[in-house]
Amino acid sequence: MHAALIAALAAHPQAPALHTVSPTARGYAGYRAWLDRLARLESAGAHLEQLGESVRGEPLLGVRFGRSQSGRCSLVLSGLHPMEWIGVETCFALMDRLNDAPPEDREVWCVPLANPDGIRRVEANLRHGRRRMVRHNARGVDLNRNFPRYWGRFSLARLLLGPLFARGAAAASEPEVRALAERFSQAALRDRGCRLDRALSLHSFGGVVLIPYGAFWRRTAHYAEQARAARDVAERIGEETGQGAYRVLQSARWVPGFTAPGMELDWFYAEHSALSLLVECSRKNQRLSAPSAWFEPFRWFNPTDPQQLAAALARALTPYVRGEA
């Protein structure tokens, strides 16, 4: 791997491992340690690349598995909403599987920490016992409302809930989104001999697989194909987790009247005509029966022991990401 990338990784301080929520919660330091180890390996099956920087200068890192210029590409994102660590854990579990058996007929790109500043803020809150909801990046922008497709459309959710769904000053105004939109644009991938035909974003919670559009009530031109892929994933998740099949919904129809302009899901589809899925990881494992959990936002989104669920979700998602199902 490039010495410059290793030096850049070493230049960013890392917090100690997190044990506040669970002994198995790795926290930002654990996630970065996994990526740092990869940067030091001479592996033919994986390549680590810095795609950009966050508002506060943290590296935005992507990992490519499989052969470059193979013609087809999958993209996996997690951590856009930094409270949703089960999505991040699932992405790392998926990367473990891809690293063990890299695909031979496509590239798979994973960006596991798409909002590093937000993840570090959540971790700091947990360490200090602050029960706060964190959805945004360091500038208070919801990165999943900042992508450069349909960004300017009216949203009732944003009108009623204001800052919770803050979209930013302009489409792709945030450095994290801008880096993703530039690096994985149709033109940039075409120059590298690749076409993105599958995309996946990992969130929490709700036990739902969402398909485009989020910005419109109407269905996409490829609705039947999108829905079929989503049902296959939802059924495999049910089999692997033992929680039953997840629901499949068009994003804009999940909460009637609450559209979501500027989503990554719509950008995947509008930019690439790709199969585009958003998985709301976890469903029956929030353990909110205790009243004390009602006032801890982190527990709304994450199981106490995330790694077992993450491993099951990764098994279910691997065929989709590899283009095998």
Segments and roles (model prediction):
Residues 1-25, 151, 157-325:
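C-terminal accessory segments enriched in acidic
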